[in-house]
């Protein structure tokens, strides 16, 4: 509070959409301009109801699965990414699809496939049911990747079951929470293969740092 008892609102910077989301929205907008409505999008292009409603008014139809779309239609995959199975289904239904997956999510996909090709079992730190996690896990056979959500999941791992292992993460996680899980996992597997650069994207990291920087002078967030 200041002397006049007025509330002060601090806005973190940076804030708002990341480059990957803006790219995905732009792909949808350009598709509308080029082909006209309807344009189908598998899952919400971004978790923002205002953006979704605005695009719906322009003729975008958001669906949960490809089975909700007539064969042969145009469809866009959201920034969160999709499994290899979804792309195969789109091809079998003769759909003209555009992949708007964030390039930083694709980086994690490539890591998963490379580790699998090299014979490593993969541990993915992320949230069960999140579209990005579903897409990443769907890049390789199910028995080659294990999802870890918390410390209990890591404590339950039988390290003697695995020879060579690798670590990847969801791109949109708490930096601090993920660091704790990684350290715990490295105690079990000192030689675990880590990403050359962390998988949590720079936009996620920057925005968390921005909130931390103003939190010290705020009474409430």
Go through each PLM region and give its residues.
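The feature marks the mature, well-folded catalytic cores of soluble enzymes
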Residues: 1-221
């Amino acid at each position: 509070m200041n002397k006049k008892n007025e509330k002060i609102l601090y806005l973190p910077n940076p804030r708002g959409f990341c480059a990957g989301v803006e790219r995905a929205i732009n792909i949808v907008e350009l598709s509308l301009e080029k082909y006209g409505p309807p344009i189908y999008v598998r899952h919400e292009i971004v978790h923002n109801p205002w953006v979704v409603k605005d695009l719906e008014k322009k003729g975008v139809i958001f669906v949960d699965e490809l089975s909700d779309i007539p064969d042969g239609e145009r469809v866009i995959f959201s920034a969160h990414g999709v499994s290899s199975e979804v792309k195969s289904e789109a091809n079998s239904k003769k759909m003209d699809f555009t992949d708007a997956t964030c390039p930083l999510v694709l980086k994690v996909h490539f890591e998963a496939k490379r580790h699998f090709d090299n014979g490593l079992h993969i541990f993915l730190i992320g949230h069960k049911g999140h579209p990005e996690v579903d897409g990443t896990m769907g890049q390789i056979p199910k028995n080659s990747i294990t999802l870890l959500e918390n410390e209990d999941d890591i404590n339950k791992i039988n390290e003697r079951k695995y020879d060579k292992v690798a670590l990847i993460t969801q791109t949109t996680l708490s930096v601090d929470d993920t660091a704790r899980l990684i350290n715990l996992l490295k105690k079990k597997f000192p030689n675990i293969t880590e990403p050359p650069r962390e998988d949590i994207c720079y936009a996620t990291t920057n925005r968390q740092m921005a909130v931390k920087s103003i939190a010290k002078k705020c009474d409430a967030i």
